[in-house]
């Protein structure tokens, strides 16, 4: 049986990061039962959260703690990830390469230049390497990193990335041939996600679900006209403190609750790539903000633009926003997604056929 390791951003307490790791693991399990996520944390101090989760589950009743909702991400990791031992920046270089037959790097923005780490290029591993939907995110690779990218990627058997912009950058700057594939969250059917949803109590239907990651932008101003006529309850997650004035912020929600909220919302408003992806999968109307200004040195809008290039989202009548199902019907979306999904899955299948 082929033994596979995955190196990705699996434990950043981020909805999209957790769900892309879940999705890629689920797809790989179609080809082998032996798949593990390498439990790497880039801080020298190893996190202990996963070590205490079993203990918390046992004492929860004693202290009247519902630890699954108090630690929703830990619950998700515990239930859906098979992890290796923990590694940090010092110990990852002692990784036993003989413990796996293949390393998959991806997905998510593990190759973002502003967060560059040789670990996410698999430089700790001596063996067969491929990438799946790894994202550079930015519109450039700094000159001082070009050789690092080139030298690392020349050791890969196959390089696939999430955005066409990354294909261009790797070709033009590094001389590396890469293929553009779907984010792994788009490879699973929506029914797969419905199976792991967890309901959120005390929400009146219909409701608007907001999911914002930008801490600076004041989105309410741009939605003023729509919100003034909205009688729905507005709930969600935002990193911006002031947003609590118009959004009822939900506490203790993790990936399973996030899926339920998207599924049951009358409308989704987001600046998140994966917020956009799951709105599409659940066939939801969504308003999508571009989180970054065009001149921002860490502009990551290429992710949203990739969805637009597929025809999945289009320019909204609300200035500056994208909107789902404005340039295509649900039926057209599913047809095009099916074509792109088959193409992306063929790359994964090809990896295992060559083993």
Per-region residue spans from a language model:
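Active-site anion-handling motifs in enzyme catalytic cores
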Residues: 1-355
């Amino acid at each position: 049986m082929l033994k596979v390791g995955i190196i990705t951003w699996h434990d950043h307490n981020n909805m999209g990061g957790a769900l892309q790791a879940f999705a890629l693991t689920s797809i790989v399990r179609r080809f082998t039962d032996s798949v593990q996520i390498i439990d790497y944390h880039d801080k020298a101090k190893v996190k202990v959260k996963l070590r205490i989760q079993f203990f918390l589950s046992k004492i929860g009743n004693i202290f009247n703690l519902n630890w699954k909702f108090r630690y929703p991400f830990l619950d998700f990791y515990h239930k859906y990830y098979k992890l290796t031992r923990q590694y940090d920046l010092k110990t990852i270089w002692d990784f036993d390469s003989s413990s796996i037959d293949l390393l998959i790097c991806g997905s998510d923005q593990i190759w973002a230049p502003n967060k560059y780490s040789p670990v996410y290029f698999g430089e700790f591993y001596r063996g067969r390497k491929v990438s799946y939907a790894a994202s550079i995110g930015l519109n450039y690779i700094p000159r001082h990193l070009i050789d690092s990218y080139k030298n690392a990627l020349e050791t890969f058997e196959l390089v696939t990335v999430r955005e066409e912009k990354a294909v261009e950058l790797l070709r033009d700057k590094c001389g590396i041939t890469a293929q553009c594939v779907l984010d792994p969250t788009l490879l699973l059917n929506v029914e797969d996600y419905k199976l792991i949803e967890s309901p959120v109590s005390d929400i009146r239907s219909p409701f608007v679900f907001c999911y914002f990651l930008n801490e600076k932008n004041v989105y309410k101003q741009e939605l003023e006209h729509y919100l003034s006529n909205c009688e729905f309850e507005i709930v969600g997650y935002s990193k911006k403190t002031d947003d609590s004035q118009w959004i009822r912020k939900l506490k203790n929600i993790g990936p399973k609750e996030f899926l339920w909220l998207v599924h049951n919302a009358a409308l989704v408003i987001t600046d998140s790539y994966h917020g956009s992806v799951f709105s599409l999968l659940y066939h939801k109307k969504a308003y999508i903000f571009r989180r970054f200004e065009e001149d921002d040195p860490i502009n990551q809008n290429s992710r949203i633009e990739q969805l637009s290039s597929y025809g999945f989202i289009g320019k909204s009548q609300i200035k500056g926003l994208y909107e789902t199902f404005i340039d295509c019907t649900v039926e057209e979306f599913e047809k095009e997604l099916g074509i792109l999904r088959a193409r992306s899955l063929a790359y994964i299948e090809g990896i295992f056929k060559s083993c």
